[in-house]
Amino acid sequence: MGKLRRRYNIKGRQQAGPGPSKGPPEPPPVQLELEDKDTLKGVDASNALVLPGKKKKKTKAPPLSKKEKKPLTKKEKKVLQKILEQKEKKSQRAEMLQKLSEVQASEAEMRLFYTTSKLGTGNRMYHTKEKADEVVAPGQEKISSLSGAHRKRRRWPSAEEEEEEEEESESELEEESELDEDPAAEPAEAGVGTTVAPLPPAPAPSSQPVPAGMTVPPPPAAAPPLPRALAKPAVFIPVNRSPEMQEERLKLPILSEEQVIMEAVAEHPIVIVCGETGSGKTTQVPQFLYEAGFSSEDSIIGVTEPRRVAAVAMSQRVAKEMNLSQRVVSYQIRYEGNVTEETRIKFMTDGVLLKEIQKDFLLLRYKVVIIDEAHERSVYTDILIGLLSRIVTLRAKRNLPLKLLIMSATLRVEDFTQNPRLFAKPPPVIKVESRQFPVTVHFNKRTPLEDYSGECFRKVCKIHRMLPAGGILVFLTGQAEVHALCRRLRKAFPPSRARPQEKDDDQKDSVEEMRKFKKSRARAKKARAEVLPQINLDHYSVLPAGEGDEDREAEVDEEEGALDSDLDLDLGDGGQDGGEQPDASLPLHVLPLYSLLAPEKQAQVFKPPPEGTRLCVVATNVAETSLTIPGIKYVVDCGKVKKRYYDRVTGVSSFRVTWVSQASADQRAGRAGRTEPGHCYRLYSSAVFGDFEQFPPPEITRRPVEDLILQMKALNVEKVINFPFPTPPSVEALLAAEELLIALGALQPPQKAERVKQLQENRLSCPITALGRTMATFPVAPRYAKMLALSRQHGCLPYAITIVASMTVRELFEELDRPAASDEELTRLKSKRARVAQMKRTWAGQGASLKLGDLMVLLGAVGACEYASCTPQFCEANGLRYKAMMEIRRLRGQLTTAVNAVCPEAELFVDPKMQPPTESQVTYLRQIVTAGLGDHLARRVQSEEMLEDKWRNAYKTPLLDDPVFIHPSSVLFKELPEFVVYQEIVETTKMYMKGVSSVEVQWIPALLPSYCQFDKPLEEPAPTYCPERGRVLCHRASVFYRVGWPLPAIEVDFPEGIDRYKHFARFLLEGQVFRKLASYRSCLLSSPGTMLKTWARLQPRTESLLRALVAEKADCHEALLAAWKKNPKYLLAEYCEWLPQAMHPDIEKAWPPTTVH
């Protein structure tokens, strides 16, 4: 049976029976006759005669039939149960919506989402801002939101008529749920999300006639179609990849984002791609662009990397994946490259692209430039992004679009997207998922402060002995720590060299060794137990005994039971540690990895380990982002990093071991889990990790920027402070850089100003000089570029190029101060140190060459190595780094090419059999080095100035208050010259000068006048005139700036002022400036020395001649010739005043007297 329908308002519609209705009865109508025969109709309540005689009986309506309640059936119970559940859901809806609103994405994020249902349908998944505005009006975006979720939909009129009646089964519970709804729910729900106004319903078609007098508005006219740009034909370049390589590519997360990335590139000039390490962005995005035709028409896809290792490795990997030759996918780094005319994808370091911008500012050969690893925020990366932001705009105006892709491994892109000076319109950001497999991060319960290297060793031993197969990657801080840990691990787990027939014997030996190891470990524990411990009461809790024991027991159980949680198992301390015992049954393939390692040794980490061994790579932060090592499952992170810090003012550099940032720690953890779920073991607690800075500071804020300032000035960026840096350097760093460049002669001095603000602006906008443009062409630091620019004379260029190349490439000699692992190694290191010290003394020589100091050692080492054909055997025998020597060779070639481009007549070439310099050339080289390193001058502390013992054998520098010392490895360590210049100061236990060369005191005011404060010209010796230079010279004493070191008087140009004009007039009258006037000297009416007398103004002839010289600023030979070129009769009248009247006609005929000089 169907359900009985309950009619609407059934009680009100029920009709009464025959009985009287409820309420007072109506009186019967009565007619009364009056005396005037009229009748009065109605009821007169006051007349008792017309009242009814008796009360009528009331009849009650029959009562409504009441049905007896029947017991509910199972079906009805289910229906009621559903209604109760619905009511419960409605009561909880407000709370649920409130919680959802807290985690709801914003509208800006919602617009970035796309649907995968349109894949392959031809519809765009990524719309530009302009097209979005055309389709949807502002404020009418229909975004899926929780806003208005509590409201009912608007019902059509027809639906209202059809649903007048409700089902009877939903009677009481339904009415309660509708009427007794929580009044607080509506405002709570109304506040969730953003309210979207509902669209007005379309008018329903009606067949009713239109009433008279009403006009029907005509339908709106269709909008004219918008003009659409002509679609360009799609370009697709086929790539023949191998099936195996294609299968590997499909596993990368970025492959699913190819359409999104390419649509964004097509619609926007600048795109930011964020994908953590391992997502494949470095290798796949260039391939996307290549297949889309961005390398057609002889164009190039440029990819910049911050490190040379990454540029070379990535070019080889992409060429292998695309099955193309390295003539098509090439690389270019500082010293080498394989770029050809066929190159279409070019990997390079950021410095190489910056040099290309100097030659071709618009980069016309490039269609796309990719800035990779932008999260590292290297100096050149920041400069490139600032320059490319303007180049993209200029190329767009010329209808030659350039696409810029910025790829970052972190989501720290606010410096790019929220920097209106850099990008006026924020570029779109595309997020790419990274890892295919999860990485579990484990923290230590305790943080080792000192012996983190030993903690790394113990952790690796535990992982290797107890965890399943998988490569191990260990992060340490420096080269010495890497080698020390490698030696310990190789000693603990020596590689197995057994033959197959010896396996059984090895197994027996390993079992016997394990048994002995357990016995020795037990004895060691017993021995440690017998030693009375030293109890420190500060290590104990103040809680009463028993309190907190449960927690401690739980921690012990957790430590022993859950290996994956911490691996914090106690293996003992010191020499008794079981990890130090050799265990040949568990071979470990240990490899080092750091930036100074030879390339062939770096490539070994990418090869599979020998069969039966586990790969363990001990690396510095070079393996943090640039390289992905295959097969790594476990990462051991010490949490430390060694950074070079520079003092902006003093230039002192120091290496400090500090904590990494949280972003760097996450990058290290990302090295695991490439092929399977991985684990990262951090040797610090989670509380320490919480105190890390979120991101490392950009490099441009931590180092001197004079080389960048010079390069930008060469690009005609005069006001560097207005450059669109992603993170601008401090004003102090900019001022220090410009002061150095002014002292080097690369920039013009700032113009004088009356206001301080204007003076500071002038100091930050000094124009570049001709010398500065020449220096900018050399790919070295400004100090070294000044040395190259000054070394053209006396045949010093080949030697200066070699010295500059050696100073640019760091760490020429091997690090021999590392700790030895055995007595044999200690003996070998001692003998090698002695040999290297002897070779340094040999290369330094004696006499004049020894005064060149450490730079002579560099020159001799490079010359000897080149003479021996630069073989690895020679480098190993003499303690030289083969990789450094090869870099010097390449840099020498590059600098020689640059010098020949600036000075073609030099005709330089790299001579492998270069002869040692002569004594005179060594002297010139010392002067050249002094002129380039003038701000790095130091003076030995004299005995009378020595106030404390710490100043013994110390030197004083202008910018430091503390003593500095010559490094013990220097050949001048025992010589102790009075004045030296140094390459750099490195702070360790003391401040040591490296790259030291001796300086003669009389050279300082002549070569470094900008650093000296000169006194007034000396009267004795008297000023003289120099015919070669055409200037007035004098002797002046001076002091070195800031420290006031007294310097001897030297002959310099006479200072500007009225006295210089007086001396020049005197030499002019004497005939020293122009020899033709010397014949008239005996006929002068007054002595030329009258010009210098205090009473000279009393004579008209002296005053008129002086005024004429000052008016044309003629204080030298060159200025006087320029004045006569403008006016040949210049000074004729003034000179005639000094001669008798009879000689005036002869003077007028011979004027100007420039025929003989």
Swiss-Prot record:
Listed GO MF terms: ATP binding; ATP hydrolysis activity; helicase activity; RNA binding; RNA helicase activity; U3 snoRNA binding
Residue spans of biased composition, Basic and acidic residues class: 499-515
Reported effect, residue 167 to S: In NEDBAVC; uncertain significance; requires 2 nucleotide substitutions
Expression (tissue specificity): Expressed in the fallopian tube, ovary, uterus and testis. Also expressed in the brain.
Result of altering residue 334 to L: In SRXY11; uncertain significance
Pfam family, one: DEAD
Effect of residue 626 to L: In SRXY11; uncertain significance
Keyword line: ATP-binding, Cytoplasm, Disease variant, Helicase, Hydrolase, Intellectual disability, Membrane, Nucleotide-binding, Nucleus
GO annotations of cellular component type: cytoplasm; nuclear membrane; nucleolus; nucleoplasm; small-subunit processome
Effect seen on changing residue 282 to A: Impairs the catalytic activity of the helicase
Catalytic activity of the protein: ATP + H2O = ADP + phosphate + H(+)
Sequence ranges of Acidic residues compositional bias: 159-184, 547-571
Annotated consequence of substituting residue 487 to H: In NEDBAVC; uncertain significance
List of residues binding ATP: 275-282
Sequence ranges assigned to domain Helicase C-terminal in this UniProt record: 459-716
Gene3D superfamilies with a match to the protein in the record: 1.20.120.1080, P-loop containing nucleotide triphosphate hydrolases (3.40.50.300)
Compartment(s): Nucleus, Nucleolus; Cytoplasm; Nucleus membrane
SMART domains linked to this entry: DEXDc, HA2, HELICc
Predominant location category: nucleus
GO aspect biological process, one term: ribosome biogenesis
Disease: Neurodevelopmental disorder with brain anomalies and with or without vertebral or cardiac anomalies: An autosomal recessive neurodevelopmental disorder characterized by severe developmental delay, impaired intellectual development, hypotonia, brain anomalies including cortical volume loss, corpus callosum dysgenesis and cerebellar hypoplasia, and variable dysmorphic features. Patients may have platyspondyly, scoliosis, and cardiac anomalies.
Subunit (UniProt): Part of the small subunit (SSU) processome, composed of more than 70 proteins and the RNA chaperone small nucleolar RNA (snoRNA) U3. Interacts with UTP14A.
Name of the protein: Probable ATP-dependent RNA helicase DHX37
Organism the protein comes from: Homo sapiens (Human)
Organism ancestry: Eukaryota, Metazoa, Chordata, Craniata, Vertebrata
Gene: DHX37
